[in-house]
């Protein structure tokens, strides 16, 4: 392979940018020239980052004055409380702040209530003022107090008081509506190169250029630790036969991992039900592990709810989390059995450690 056949550094060029409506932006980008095989590597990584790791601001809770429960109705209003909440959940906002913000909706009927009637702080803007909320069919009023948060720092699921008329909304609104990529050949034979074409659709809270930039930065941050690889482990040659895992217990550990664990003590202690294959705990010397103090729990593939529960009790890094046992996790408020199992499995898969 001729490593010098690419004469210039790869670059990204915007081929097209269309605003089809307030909540639908389209962008088309080309990344070139690339070595064969690089396009699919970048395309796969950027697609996952775009669809799962780009954040935006949305409504996370709403207090509806006069509402008794989610399926109740208010006199003179066509929609039920449930329908109103669904409409609020779909409203698209634009904001640069990560701080929690408050807004209020006051409207006197009759008339149609839309997103333009929400009073917001200057740091938050509504993308589409025409988004429908409700219809008041008689001279009545509606009052809704809303809380807005960035999905990156959302904590409302755990910290909002459970008062009558307050409803928690799932912060699931993503700025990237869809993403496709295609790979095209440039040149022939030994001079063959590749071009990666990215197509991105957003909801208007961020432009296609902005989400590409944010996703790329997230990938860059993820790979930074690999630029500073150090030798944190000293391999041990012998492992006592009595302390070896059985095939069932060690099916997810390869020999290199076992050798790195070396002579560390293996503790036979039940963690999860027998069918989970997590019936052995690995006691590791945390000081000999990689520098986990600077690695956020956000790097774990766990739900936002589980992550927020951990942060609420002061667990922000992997190293802090590894000091907890499974029983300790069960004591954390709002952290259920399913979330604990999710955390235990994520720690085992990512760091080869089983919580006691």
Swiss-Prot record:
SMART domains: RPOLD (SM00662). GO terms for cellular component: chloroplast; DNA-directed RNA polymerase complex; mitochondrion. Its EC number is 2.7.7.6. Keywords: Chloroplast, DNA-directed RNA polymerase, Nucleotidyltransferase, Plastid, Transcription, Transferase. GO terms for molecular function: DNA binding; DNA-directed RNA polymerase activity; protein dimerization activity. It holds the Pfam family RNA_pol_A_bac. Residues 267-356 are annotated as: Alpha C-terminal domain (alpha-CTD). It is found in: Plastid, Chloroplast. GO terms for biological process: DNA-templated transcription. It comes from the Eukaryota. It catalyses: RNA(n) + a ribonucleoside 5'-triphosphate = RNA(n+1) + diphosphate. HAMAP family: RNApol_bact_RpoA. In plastids the minimal PEP RNA polymerase catalytic core is composed of four subunits: alpha, beta, beta', and beta''. When a (nuclear-encoded) sigma factor is associated with the core the holoenzyme is formed, which can initiate transcription. DNA-dependent RNA polymerase catalyzes the transcription of DNA into RNA using the four ribonucleoside triphosphates as substrates. The N-terminal domain is essential for RNAP assembly and basal transcription, whereas the C-terminal domain is involved in interaction with transcriptional regulators and with upstream promoter elements. This is DNA-directed RNA polymerase subunit alpha. It comes from Zygnema circumcarinatum. The gene is rpoA.
